[in-house]
Protein backbone atom coordinates (compact mmCIF):
# COMPACT_ATOMS: atom_id res chain seq x y z
CA UNK A 1 0.00 0.00 0.00
CA UNK A 2 2.76 2.46 0.96
CA UNK A 3 4.69 1.72 -2.24
CA UNK A 4 1.53 2.37 -4.26
CA UNK A 5 0.97 5.71 -2.51
CA UNK A 6 4.57 6.80 -3.15
CA UNK A 7 4.30 5.86 -6.83
CA UNK A 8 0.98 7.66 -7.16
CA UNK A 9 1.50 10.84 -5.14
CA UNK A 10 5.22 11.05 -4.38
CA UNK A 11 6.78 12.25 -1.12
CA UNK A 12 6.08 15.57 0.60
CA UNK A 13 3.05 16.10 -1.66
CA UNK A 14 -0.41 16.43 -0.08
CA UNK A 15 -3.14 14.07 -1.22
CA UNK A 16 -6.76 13.48 -0.24
CA UNK A 17 -7.84 10.08 1.01
CA UNK A 18 -10.69 10.27 -1.51
CA UNK A 19 -8.08 10.24 -4.30
CA UNK A 20 -6.73 6.82 -3.29
CA UNK A 21 -7.71 3.81 -5.35
CA UNK A 22 -5.98 0.47 -4.78
CA UNK A 23 -6.78 -2.64 -6.79
CA UNK A 24 -10.34 -3.71 -5.96
CA UNK A 25 -10.16 -2.89 -2.27
CA UNK A 26 -13.05 -1.01 -0.64
CA UNK A 27 -12.83 2.51 0.78
CA UNK A 28 -13.22 1.06 4.27
CA UNK A 29 -10.11 -1.09 3.75
CA UNK A 30 -8.24 1.93 2.39
CA UNK A 31 -9.23 4.05 5.41
CA UNK A 32 -8.00 1.34 7.78
CA UNK A 33 -4.72 0.97 5.87
CA UNK A 34 -4.12 4.72 5.93
CA UNK A 35 -4.84 4.83 9.67
CA UNK A 36 -2.34 2.01 10.23
CA UNK A 37 0.33 3.78 8.17
CA UNK A 38 -0.27 6.94 10.21
CA UNK A 39 0.30 5.00 13.45
CA UNK A 40 3.60 3.72 12.06
CA UNK A 41 4.65 7.22 11.03
CA UNK A 42 4.85 6.22 7.37
CA UNK A 43 2.35 8.92 6.39
CA UNK A 44 1.24 12.10 8.17
CA UNK A 45 -2.30 13.40 8.68
CA UNK A 46 -2.26 17.11 7.75
CA UNK A 47 -5.86 18.22 7.70
CA UNK A 48 -9.31 16.72 7.41
CA UNK A 49 -8.95 13.94 4.83
CA UNK A 50 -5.51 15.19 3.69
CA UNK A 51 -2.19 13.38 4.17
CA UNK A 52 1.39 13.29 2.92
CA UNK A 53 4.29 10.84 2.86
CA UNK A 54 7.38 12.29 4.61
CA UNK A 55 10.47 12.63 2.46
CA UNK A 56 13.70 11.42 4.02
CA UNK A 57 17.34 12.06 3.23
CA UNK A 58 20.62 11.23 4.96
CA UNK A 59 20.01 14.03 7.48
CA UNK A 60 16.53 12.85 8.46
CA UNK A 61 13.04 13.98 7.49
CA UNK A 62 12.77 16.84 4.99
CA UNK A 63 10.41 19.57 6.35
CA UNK A 64 7.00 19.72 4.70
CA UNK A 65 6.02 23.00 2.99
CA UNK A 66 2.55 23.94 4.30
CA UNK A 67 1.95 26.10 1.21
CA UNK A 68 1.51 22.87 -0.77
CA UNK A 69 -1.65 21.94 1.12
CA UNK A 70 -2.96 25.50 0.84
CA UNK A 71 -2.37 25.45 -2.92
CA UNK A 72 -4.06 22.07 -3.31
CA UNK A 73 -7.04 22.87 -1.12
CA UNK A 74 -7.80 26.43 -2.24
CA UNK A 75 -5.81 27.42 -5.36
CA UNK A 76 -5.17 24.55 -7.76
CA UNK A 77 -5.72 20.80 -7.46
CA UNK A 78 -3.90 19.16 -10.36
CA UNK A 79 -5.38 20.95 -13.41
CA UNK A 80 -8.43 22.25 -11.55
CA UNK A 81 -7.91 25.96 -10.85
CA UNK A 82 -10.21 26.97 -8.00
CA UNK A 83 -8.76 30.10 -6.43
CA UNK A 84 -6.17 32.87 -6.32
CA UNK A 85 -4.19 34.95 -3.82
CA UNK A 86 -5.31 38.49 -3.07
CA UNK A 87 -4.90 41.45 -0.75
CA UNK A 88 -1.58 42.25 0.90
CA UNK A 89 -0.24 38.78 0.14
CA UNK A 90 -0.72 39.34 -3.61
CA UNK A 91 0.94 42.76 -3.34
CA UNK A 92 3.90 41.03 -1.70
CA UNK A 93 3.99 38.30 -4.37
CA UNK A 94 4.04 40.88 -7.16
CA UNK A 95 6.72 42.96 -5.45
CA UNK A 96 4.43 45.97 -5.01
CA UNK A 97 4.87 45.64 -1.25
CA UNK A 98 8.10 44.60 0.45
CA UNK A 99 6.35 43.60 3.68
CA UNK A 100 5.38 39.93 3.96
CA UNK A 101 1.95 39.81 5.65
CA UNK A 102 1.18 37.38 8.45
CA UNK A 103 -2.18 36.55 6.87
CA UNK A 104 -2.59 34.93 3.44
CA UNK A 105 -5.70 36.21 1.68
CA UNK A 106 -7.40 33.88 -0.81
CA UNK A 107 -10.52 33.83 -2.97
CA UNK A 108 -11.59 30.23 -3.57
CA UNK A 109 -14.50 28.19 -4.88
CA UNK A 110 -13.99 26.01 -1.80
CA UNK A 111 -15.12 28.81 0.50
CA UNK A 112 -18.86 29.41 0.83
CA UNK A 113 -18.76 32.23 3.39
CA UNK A 114 -18.13 35.83 2.44
CA UNK A 115 -15.10 35.91 4.71
CA UNK A 116 -13.55 33.46 7.17
CA UNK A 117 -10.24 33.07 9.03
CA UNK A 118 -8.71 29.60 9.32
CA UNK A 119 -5.33 28.21 10.35
CA UNK A 120 -3.61 25.45 8.39
CA UNK A 121 -0.25 24.05 9.49
CA UNK A 122 0.57 27.28 11.32
CA UNK A 123 -0.47 29.53 8.43
CA UNK A 124 -3.25 32.07 9.00
CA UNK A 125 -5.62 32.32 6.03
CA UNK A 126 -8.33 34.87 5.28
CA UNK A 127 -10.68 33.08 2.89
CA UNK A 128 -13.32 34.70 0.71
CA UNK A 129 -16.15 33.37 -1.39
CA UNK A 130 -15.47 34.53 -4.98
CA UNK A 131 -17.76 37.00 -6.76
CA UNK A 132 -18.23 34.41 -9.50
CA UNK A 133 -16.97 30.87 -10.03
CA UNK A 134 -13.22 30.68 -10.61
CA UNK A 135 -11.70 28.50 -13.32
CA UNK A 136 -8.47 28.30 -15.33
CA UNK A 137 -9.85 30.72 -17.92
CA UNK A 138 -10.83 33.58 -15.60
CA UNK A 139 -8.62 33.22 -12.49
CA UNK A 140 -6.01 35.71 -13.71
CA UNK A 141 -8.46 38.45 -14.69
CA UNK A 142 -10.51 38.03 -11.49
CA UNK A 143 -7.28 38.22 -9.47
CA UNK A 144 -6.30 41.39 -11.37
CA UNK A 145 -9.68 43.02 -10.75
CA UNK A 146 -9.53 42.19 -7.03
CA UNK A 147 -6.07 43.75 -7.01
CA UNK A 148 -7.40 46.95 -8.61
CA UNK A 149 -10.42 46.98 -6.31
CA UNK A 150 -8.22 47.05 -3.21
CA UNK A 151 -5.26 49.07 -4.47
CA UNK A 152 -4.47 52.52 -3.06
CA UNK A 153 -4.05 54.52 -6.28
CA UNK A 154 -2.14 57.33 -4.54
CA UNK A 155 0.67 54.91 -3.61
CA UNK A 156 1.28 53.80 -7.21
CA UNK A 157 4.46 55.10 -8.80
CA UNK A 158 5.79 54.16 -12.24
CA UNK A 159 7.74 51.20 -10.85
CA UNK A 160 4.62 49.69 -9.26
CA UNK A 161 2.58 50.36 -12.40
CA UNK A 162 5.25 48.49 -14.34
CA UNK A 163 4.86 45.48 -12.01
CA UNK A 164 1.11 45.48 -12.61
CA UNK A 165 1.69 45.84 -16.36
CA UNK A 166 4.02 42.83 -16.25
CA UNK A 167 1.29 40.80 -14.53
CA UNK A 168 -1.19 41.83 -17.23
CA UNK A 169 1.22 40.78 -19.99
CA UNK A 170 2.29 37.50 -18.36
CA UNK A 171 -1.34 36.44 -17.88
CA UNK A 172 -2.52 37.78 -21.24
CA UNK A 173 -5.29 39.82 -19.70
CA UNK A 174 -7.36 41.77 -22.23
CA UNK A 175 -9.90 44.59 -22.10
CA UNK A 176 -12.44 42.14 -23.48
CA UNK A 177 -11.97 39.96 -20.37
CA UNK A 178 -12.23 42.98 -18.09
CA UNK A 179 -15.47 44.06 -19.80
CA UNK A 180 -16.89 40.58 -19.18
CA UNK A 181 -16.10 40.42 -15.46
CA UNK A 182 -16.13 44.05 -14.28
CA UNK A 183 -19.93 43.90 -13.65
CA UNK A 184 -19.22 41.55 -10.71
CA UNK A 185 -17.16 44.26 -9.00
CA UNK A 186 -18.06 47.55 -7.27
CA UNK A 187 -17.74 50.91 -9.05
CA UNK A 188 -14.52 51.51 -7.11
CA UNK A 189 -12.74 48.89 -9.22
CA UNK A 190 -13.48 50.68 -12.49
CA UNK A 191 -12.61 54.04 -10.94
CA UNK A 192 -9.23 52.73 -9.74
CA UNK A 193 -8.49 51.26 -13.18
CA UNK A 194 -9.01 54.67 -14.78
CA UNK A 195 -7.42 56.88 -12.10
CA UNK A 196 -4.32 54.67 -11.95
CA UNK A 197 -4.17 54.71 -15.78
CA UNK A 198 -3.57 50.96 -15.64
CA UNK A 199 -6.57 50.34 -17.92
CA UNK A 200 -4.68 52.04 -20.76
CA UNK A 201 -1.96 49.41 -20.47
CA UNK A 202 -4.37 46.53 -21.06
CA UNK A 203 -4.48 45.34 -24.69
CA UNK A 204 -7.75 45.00 -26.56
Write out the residue ranges for each language-model feature:
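Short acidic-hydrophobic surface loop/beta-edge motif
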Residues: 114-120
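Short gly/ser-rich loop at a beta-strand->alpha-helix junction or flexible surface loop bordering the NTP-binding
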Residues: 46-50, 78-114
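A short, charged helix-loop
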Residues: 121-129
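Hydrophobic alpha-helical interaction segments
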Residues: 129-204
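Short, surface-exposed loop/turn motifs that are enriched in glycine and acidic residues
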Residues: 60, 76-80, 134
Amino acid sequence: MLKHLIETFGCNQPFAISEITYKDYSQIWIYKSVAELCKKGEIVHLDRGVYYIPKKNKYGIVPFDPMKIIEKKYIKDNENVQGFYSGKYLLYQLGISKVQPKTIEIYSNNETQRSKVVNICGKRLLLHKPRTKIDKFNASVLCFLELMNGIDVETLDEYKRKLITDYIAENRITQRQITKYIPYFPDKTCRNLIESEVIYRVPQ
